[in-house]
Amino acid sequence: MYLNATILGQVIAFILFVWFCMKYVWNPLMSVIEERQKKIIDSLESIKTSKMESERIRNEALACLKQAHIKSEEIIKYAYECKMQILHTAQNEAYQERDKILSQTQIQIDQERERIISELRNHVSKLVIESTEKVIDTSINKIIDYDFVDKIIKQLSNYED
């Protein structure tokens, strides 16, 4: 195989091309590739960190929701207890008011009964006196009538006491 000038020229041109590429193209190209790789690695780490952070925030949110649920149950329980206490208090007050009204009504009934009994006694006394006067007027024997009148007066005085 003969080495001629064309092949030798092509080898020299190729070597110069490789040297030129290594000196002016390869370094910037490799730095761009390395920079891109570094950005990709940083992005992956950032994604991993963000994923961990989002998981932490999610867990915090779940814990917060549990606390809110527990607190809402406590509030509902407290409201129920307050409702029951208010109902119990209102019921006791209603019973007290009922007892007060009943006692006042009983007092009024007793007073009215006493008043009516007193009026009836007075009315009966007047009737007895009137009837006694009529009997005395029509009676023949006045001594018996006086005894009768005294007896009625004593009975009436016993009723009034």
From Swiss-Prot:
One Pfam family in the UniProt entry: ATP-synt_B
One GO CC term, this protein: proton-transporting ATP synthase complex
Gene Ontology MF term list: proton-transporting ATP synthase activity, rotational mechanism; proton-transporting ATPase activity, rotational mechanism
Topology within the bilayer: Single-pass membrane protein
SUPFAM superfamilies referenced in this protein's UniProt entry, alphabetically: F1F0 ATP synthase subunit B, membrane domain
Disulfide bonds, paired cysteine numbers: none
Subcellular location: Cell inner membrane
Transmembrane segments: 1-21
Family matches, as InterPro entries: ATP_synth_B-like_membr_sf, ATP_synth_b/b'su_bac/chlpt, ATP_synth_F0_bsu_bac, ATP_synthase_B_chain
Protein name (database record): ATP synthase subunit b
Gene assigned in the entry: atpF
